[in-house]
């Protein structure tokens, strides 16, 4: 998913050009597609699909979930893929593509780590957050709270009580898991409605469906953390420094990144992180193996 920095997105997609990967891109509706110059992309192995249906993305809003689900559906309809990896346009791979492909091909593993919502986070689902109201959103959230208008901090599905789970937005799920998520939402549309006015539902809706499934919960990398575990330790795929906000990574983080054993790092930015990405590319170059014909 991309909303800024077309130059960085170009570098990311061309770095991921590999016989085992295809790329599906959603560009924020607020952005001008012409700035991205997709017609100039010259991929040798990966198929590139740019979604025509676009959502106006707002931070913390359900629109991020809608865009993610649109990408899932597009990929499900386009081919028989084994793994669905969600990335932002400001991510960058740490390992060579062949190593990434090997790691992500592990069977019966869901690359996601999460936990039941902690008490200090109950507000994320109990309160109503009206992100589309712009500068007035806080007023309405406080008004609803003062009037005692709140949601339950759990959701009922097929007469079962589901706890709400948290997990960072970026993960890599199996085709079976993605199909389960889409089927569940189709059969139970009230789930999407429940999270519509939540706080950052992109970190709640998909984890809640996944971790309330006994089959997929045991396939996750982690389904529980000690209370107050830092966000940085909850990312399944990414090296990230969220202190106090997401750091734009530079070359001084190189050794931390390369020793992290994560698959990707974020955030990177063209003109700021170029030396870091060059260093990663150089470290990986000798390990890259010539690729063969495209495989779905």
Please state what every model-predicted region is.
Residues 1-296:
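ER/Golgi luminal nucleotide-sugar-dependent glycosyltransferases, focusing on the catalytic module
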């Amino acid at each position: 998913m991309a909303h800024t920095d077309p130059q960085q997105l170009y570098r990311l997609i061309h770095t991921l050009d590999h016989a085992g990967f295809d790329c599906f891109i959603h560009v924020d509706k607020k952005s001008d597609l012409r700035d991205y110059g997709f017609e100039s992309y010259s991929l040798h192995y990966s198929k590139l699909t740019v979604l025509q249906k676009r959502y106006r993305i707002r931070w913390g809003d359900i629109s991020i979930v809608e865009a993610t689900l649109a990408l899932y559906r597009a990929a499900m309809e386009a081919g028989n893929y084994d793994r669905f990896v969600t990335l932002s346009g400001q991510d960058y791979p740490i390992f060579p593509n062949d190593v990434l492909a090997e790691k992500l091909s592990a069977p019966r593993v869901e690359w996601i780590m999460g936990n039941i919502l902690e008490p200090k986070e109950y507000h994320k689902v109990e309160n109503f957050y009206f992100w589309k109201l712009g500068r007035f959103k806080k007023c309405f959230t406080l008004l609803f709270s003062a009037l005692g208008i709140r949601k339950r901090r759990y959701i009922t599905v097929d007469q079962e009580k589901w706890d709400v789970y948290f997990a960072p937005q970026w993960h890599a799920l199996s085709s079976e898991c993605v199909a389960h998520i889409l089927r569940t939402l189709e059969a139970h549309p009230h789930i999407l409605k429940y999270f519509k006015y939540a706080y950052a539902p992109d970190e709640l809706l998909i984890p809640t469906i996944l971790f309330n499934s006994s089959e997929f919960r045991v396939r996750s990398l982690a389904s529980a953390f000690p209370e107050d575990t830092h966000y940085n330790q909850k990312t399944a795929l990414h090296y990230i420094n969220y202190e106090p906000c997401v750091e734009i990574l530079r070359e001084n983080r190189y050794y931390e990144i390369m020793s992290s054993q994560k698959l990707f790092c974020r955030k990177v930015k063209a003109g700021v992180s170029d030396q870091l990405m060059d260093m990663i590319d150089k470290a990986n170059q000798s390990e890259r193996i010539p690729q063969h014909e495209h495989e779905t």
